[in-house]
């Protein structure tokens, strides 16, 4: 904004503060900032005025972003943060996608029936598709005649591992498989709506001669479990939630189809965007630009990335843990109500089911721990 860009954020914010640095902001505010899939509420430009629009949340955000692009000041460069609620829990797709994927079943992931052997923290989880998806997640309808409070309790049944089934004849393995299909199909139906919204913006850029000179980034705040390890949700340092999508399009500077396996962190996103815009990166910003990762074959990225999760026990009983990933290894320490270390060789065990912490030379453990301590010192954690 200080460098002449017209700036806007539309959609999910979820930080508990009013956005600053934007010429225009319209962010979700109900359900703790997550927003709801239907009848979402927004705060516009930090004012008390709340707008409720009776359409699907993805469609509202999509339409508002197109409107902003059409009506912006075209004499200025722009920066737009276009942020969807979908596919956050409880995965309620737009009605136009209700029948999508209804004619086939998705294959279950390789680790769908993981027994968590050798991984104490994982074995204590409360995010299993089999045991912890509730009635609301599966789109069941509460019985009539219940109070609002009792209706909410009825829908939440299953969160704590309580057994329930939609049909008396559906149980055991068949019930687990049924829950998975309902979950994955609703998740991907929500994603289809996001795909539509992203496509509309890309089409707008093409139709208005902006595609060649606009940097487009598609990313997320984390990955997600789609049945891997038998789970839904996120939080763990295991690959499926630890890794984030990061696709970038800038025809003038990046050759289509370029793929990099260099390690980067989300704190690098800001400096990278500033670098692409030709803006000096402030000294007090953590992270570093990886702009040259796409154009310089000699670019050397990070040799390790750091992670720390500390919320417990409210969210799915995921133990607080910190750790480090290199190109070959991942070292994790669960430290709150247990003292457990895990080490994975990502080259031979990409699914992270074989904890080798007690099976490798002590010299390797010592070296990795020293590297981990160095990262903690760097980030003052």
Name the predicted role of every residue range:
Residues 3-8, 22-23, 73-80, 210-216, ...:
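Loop/turn elements at helix/coil->beta-strand transitions in domains of secreted/extracellular proteins
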Residues 30-53, 70-75, 81-264, 276-284, ...:
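Active-site-proximal cap/lid insertion segments
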Residues 1-9, 19-20, 24-45, 377:
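Active-site segment of extracytoplasmic enzymes that catalyze sulfate/phosphate-ester chemistry
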Residues 1-5, 70-74, 203-206, 274-278, ...:
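Sec-exported extracytoplasmic/periplasmic mature domains
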Residues 1-14, 52-54, 58-61, 67-68:
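Long, well-ordered early-domain segments
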Residues 9, 18, 57, 61, ...:
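Stable alpha-helical elements in mature extracytoplasmic
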Residues 349:
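Intrinsically disordered, low-complexity polar regions and short flexible loop motifs
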Residues 21-24, 29-33, 50, 90, ...:
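C-terminal cap/loop subdomain of S1 sulfatases and analogous C-terminal strand-loop tails that border
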């Amino acid at each position: 904004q200080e460098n002449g860009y017209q700036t806007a954020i539309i959609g999910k914010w979820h930080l508990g503060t009013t956005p600053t640095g934007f010429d225009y902001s319209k962010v979700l505010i109900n359900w703790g900032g997550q927003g709801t899939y239907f009848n979402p509420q927004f705060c516009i430009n930090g004012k008390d005025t709340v707008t409720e629009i009776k359409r699907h949340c993805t469609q509202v955000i999509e339409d508002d972003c197109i409107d902003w692009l059409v009506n912006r000041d075209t004499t200025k460069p722009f920066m737009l943060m276009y942020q969807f609620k979908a596919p956050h829990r409880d995965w309620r797709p737009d009605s136009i996608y209700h029948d999508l994927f209804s004619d086939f079943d998705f294959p279950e992931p390789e680790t769908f029936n993981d027994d968590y052997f050798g991984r104490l923290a994982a074995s204590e989880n409360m995010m299993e598709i089999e045991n912890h998806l509730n009635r609301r997640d599966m789109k069941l309808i509460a019985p009539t005649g219940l109070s609002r409070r009792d209706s909410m309790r009825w829908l939440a049944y299953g969160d704590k591992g309580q057994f329930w089934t939609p049909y008396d004849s559906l149980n055991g393995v068949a019930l687990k498989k049924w829950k998975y299909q309902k979950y994955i199909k609703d998740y991907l139906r929500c994603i289809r709506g996001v795909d539509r919204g992203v496509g509309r913006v890309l089409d707008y850029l093409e139709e208005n001669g902006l595609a060649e000179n606009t940097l487009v980034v598609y990313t997320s705040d984390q990955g997600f479990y789609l049945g891997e390890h038998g789970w839904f949700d996120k939080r763990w340092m295991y690959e499926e939630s630890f890794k984030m999508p990061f696709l970038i399009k800038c025809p003038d500077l990046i050759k289509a189809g370029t793929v990099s396996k260099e390690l980067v962190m989300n704190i690098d996103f800001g400096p990278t965007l500033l670098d692409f815009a030709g803006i000096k990166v402030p000294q007090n910003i953590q992270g570093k630009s990886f702009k040259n990762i796409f154009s310089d074959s000699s670019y050397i990225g990070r040799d390790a990335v750091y992670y720390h999760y500390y919320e417990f026990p409210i969210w799915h009983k995921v133990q607080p843990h910190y750790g480090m990933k290199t190109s070959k290894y991942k070292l994790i320490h669960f430290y709150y109500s247990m003292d457990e270390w895990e080490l994975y060789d990502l080259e031979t065990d990409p699914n992270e089911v074989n904890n080798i912490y007690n099976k490798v030379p002590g010299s390797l453990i010592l070296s990795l721990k020293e590297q981990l301590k160095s990262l903690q010192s760097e980030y003052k954690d």
